Design a protein with these regions (language model features):
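Residue-level detector of transmembrane insertion/anchoring sites
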Residues: 5, 13, 22-23, 68, ...
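Short hydrophobic targeting helices and cationic amphipathic motifs
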Residues: 6, 11, 34-37
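N-terminal amphipathic/hydrophobic targeting modules at extreme N-termini
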Residues: 10-19, 23, 41
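Class I S-adenosyl-L-methionine-dependent methyltransferase catalytic core
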Residues: 26, 31-228
Length: 228
């Protein structure tokens, strides 16, 4: 993908590759506003940026450290996900578990929409630190736990209305099935709850006995599971 000169300038300023004088700061913020206004997301190739879509912090931009090993859910897929959730729950009265939380992208969206009880789990220390810092700054009720997702499920005793998992897209299919099994065998989902797994659209989980349906958006799929 060819990057226009103005985008190269933005990236150079953002990454401090050119002197950051007063006029440079003006250009930096002007270009940033231009990119977001017209949805030109070239710099998203270089920085892990997020946008809170709705709720108390609607439209707020968050930029995570670029060295975090994550792949944030896209705005389009995230908006579609929460449209689904709004048909099932009052988000201001549910208990949520966010597995493979990464930058905390999904947890922040729940927090902005008034969810009172959110647990975010990730095994990467940098991700855990970033989520804790951001949740504190935004005053979101997010408990952040550093743990492997499977270990957490094996040891946890609580149940949740929504369990969302966004594992790496290259996670073997048998591990995706294991994740579903742990949730239901250990009764970690409330009776009317939903388990949602984000995964590559190349994978189908419809043979799982707890599978309800899936939604596909480009290369992303959300598989929904419930108590049957």
């Amino acid at each position: 993908m060819a990057i226009p000169d103005y985008a190269r300038l933005y990236l150079a300023l953002y990454k401090r590759q050119v002197p950051l004088r007063r006029e440079s700061v003006y250009v930096l913020f002007s270009l940033k506003n231009f990119f977001y206004r017209y949805k030109i997301r070239i710099f998203a190739l270089y920085f892990k940026d997020m946008r809170i879509i709705s709720g108390s912090h609607r439209g707020k931009q968050l930029i995570a450290p670029k060295n975090l090993p994550v792949r944030p859910t896209t705005d389009f897929a995230k908006e579609s996900l929460f449209n689904i959730l709004n048909n099932y729950f009052y988000l201001d009265s549910i208990k949520v578990l966010d597995l493979f939380a990464g930058t905390g992208n999904i947890s922040y969206e729940f927090g902005s929409r008034g969810c009172p009880d959110i647990t975010a789990v990730d095994s990467h220390a940098g991700c855990v630190q970033y989520i804790h810092k951001t949740a504190t700054a935004l005053s979101y009720p997010i408990e952040v736990i550093k743990s492997d997702a499977f270990t957490f499920l094996e040891r946890n005793l609580s149940s949740y209305d929504v369990i969302f998992a966004d594992p790496p897209y290259d996670l073997p299919e048998q591990d995706l099935e294991r994740l579903v099994s742990l949730v239901f065998e250990r009764n970690l989902l409330a009776p009317d709850g939903l388990l949602i797994i984000e995964h590559s659209a190349k994978i189908s989980m419809e043979e799982n006995p707890y599978f309800d349906h899936d939604r596909r958006y480009g290369g992303t799929a959300f598989s929904l599971f419930n108590n049957v």
